[in-house]
């Protein structure tokens, strides 16, 4: 059987074209591509259960992206499953499935599972992509995410983002409020708490490798510590005691340095720390509040916000603090800039005032404002929307969204995701209130 699988998959790489047009997810909203994720064939009951669960995760990943429309299995006409046969394409076209995913799960003598899949174009009747994965049972969800990533990449031309993690601050709804650092899959599954709730914690950040996080903890009202936590071993260590720090550091692409804002003598400035020597280097000067620094993907520039001209605006400087340029020119106050991993856009929070009071907005602008000073675009607004962060492919933004208390319901805070086009806004389910999300890179 394995030889047959390898033979079939070897045919994939001779395919150079297919009927579907590549989806461009920057050009506004497009109709989702209909896709059928067929039942995965299995060699025993354990593999059958695993395959059933994987189909649900793959379908959900593709649906959440907003670019695919999984077709209900109740509509399927063809009854054959697995990857060892050529599909009856006319039957899939009859239910308007442009794409078809067939798969197979086999339990190996080692106890691991071999998972194989093929993505078909039903219009040209050709294979597009396929792969064989070998995973222990406890990693079956990651295998499903990886398959969805492969499908997403083949059809959009961009890397997928499903095999990723989110770290965030979880807050209990009952009094006294308990804040804990929590970790979950990008879709809200596998939620677990990383801190015990005994101290106030804020702004968790992933290290570049995604196997460590850093966060701010208030040991006392006056003592603020930055902690490093190894997600593989669970061990914690103190990076430093930084009086006046308000946000956890953000890390350079090479992982050797980090930037943070620290308040001293009535002013708040941006500092860079060498993680090996723990030496601090001040990057901004003058009076005012300079905060929320974020590196560009190549590490050569830093975006941050500053009220040096009276109202918080966004600025870019070289990573050594030179060549400062203002990049925001609209009305309102700007905060929390986050540079896209692709380097093309910067996301931000913007606060505007009107007759109804303050409105919070999440927006994006081009990272090279000299090319277009009118590139700013608001993609969502609300009573409280803040803390934007990017998917590793730079095509989705995750953020925190809050609602005020009312006579009928208490206030709440949740995590949402939205495409950079401003479409497909959806909630990421968490067991309690949630804020300060941070998106990992694709896992190894």
UniProtKB/Swiss-Prot annotation:
GO terms for biological process: cell division; protein import. It is found in: Periplasm. Residues 1-19 form the signal peptide. It holds the Pfam family TolB_N. Keywords: Cell cycle, Cell division, Periplasm, Signal. It comes from the Bacteria. GO terms for cellular component: periplasmic space. Belongs to the TolB family. The Tol-Pal system is composed of five core proteins: the inner membrane proteins TolA, TolQ and TolR, the periplasmic protein TolB and the outer membrane protein Pal. They form a network linking the inner and outer membranes and the peptidoglycan layer. Part of the Tol-Pal system, which plays a role in outer membrane invagination during cell division and is important for maintaining outer membrane integrity. This is Tol-Pal system protein TolB.
């Amino acid at each position: 059987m394995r030889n047959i699988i390898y033979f079939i998959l070897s045919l994939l790489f001779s395919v150079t074209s297919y009927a579907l047009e590549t989806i461009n997810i920057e050009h506004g909203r497009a109709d989702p591509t209909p896709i059928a994720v067929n039942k995965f064939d299995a060699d025993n009951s354990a593999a059958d259960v695993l395959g059933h669960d994987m189909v649900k995760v793959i379908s959900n990943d593709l649906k959440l992206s907003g670019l695919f429309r999984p077709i209900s299995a109740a509509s399927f006409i063809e009854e054959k499953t697995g990857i060892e046969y050529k599909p009856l394409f006319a039957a899939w076209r009859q239910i308007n499935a442009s794409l078809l995913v067939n798969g197979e799960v086999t339990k190996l003598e080692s106890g691991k599972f071999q998972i194989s899949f093929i993505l078909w174009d039903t219009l040209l009747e050709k294979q597009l992509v396929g792969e064989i994965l070998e995973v222990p049972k406890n990693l079956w969800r990651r295998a499903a995410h990886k398959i969805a990533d492969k499908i997403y990449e083949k059809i959009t031309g961009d890397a997928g983002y499903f095999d990723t993690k989110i770290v965030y601050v979880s807050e209990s709804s009952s009094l006294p409020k308990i804040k804990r650092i929590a970790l979950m899959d990008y879709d809200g599954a596998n939620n677990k708490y990383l801190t015990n709730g005994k101290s106030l914690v804020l702004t968790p950040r992933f290290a570049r490798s995604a196997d460590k996080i850093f966060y701010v903890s208030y040991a006392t009202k006056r003592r603020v510590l930055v902690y490093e936590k190894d997600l593989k071993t669970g061990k914690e260590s103190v990076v430093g005691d930084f009086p006046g720090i308000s946000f956890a550091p953000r890390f350079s692409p090479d992982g050797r340095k980090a930037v943070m804002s620290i308040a001293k003598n009535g002013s708040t400035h941006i500092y860079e720390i060498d993680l090996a020597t723990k030496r601090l280097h001040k990057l901004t000067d003058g009076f005012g509040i300079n905060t929320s620094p974020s590196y560009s993907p190549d590490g050569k520039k830093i975006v941050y916000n500053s009220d040096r001209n009276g109202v918080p605006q966004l600025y870019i400087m070289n990573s050594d603090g030179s060549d400062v340029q203002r990049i925001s020119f609209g009305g309102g106050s700007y905060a929390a800039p986050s540079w896209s991993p692709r380097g093309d856009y910067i996301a931000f929070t913007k606060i505007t005032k009107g007759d109804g009071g303050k409105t919070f907005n999440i927006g994006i602008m081009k990272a090279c404002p000299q090319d277009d000073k009118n590139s700013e675009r608001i993609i969502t607004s609300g009573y409280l929307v803040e803390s934007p962060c990017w998917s590793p492919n730079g095509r989705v933004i995750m953020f925190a969204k809050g609602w005020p208390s009312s006579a009928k319901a208490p206030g709440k805070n949740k995590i949402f995701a939205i495409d950079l086009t401003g479409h497909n806004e959806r909630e990421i389910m968490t067991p309690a209130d949630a804020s300060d999300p941070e998106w990992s890179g694709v896992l190894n």
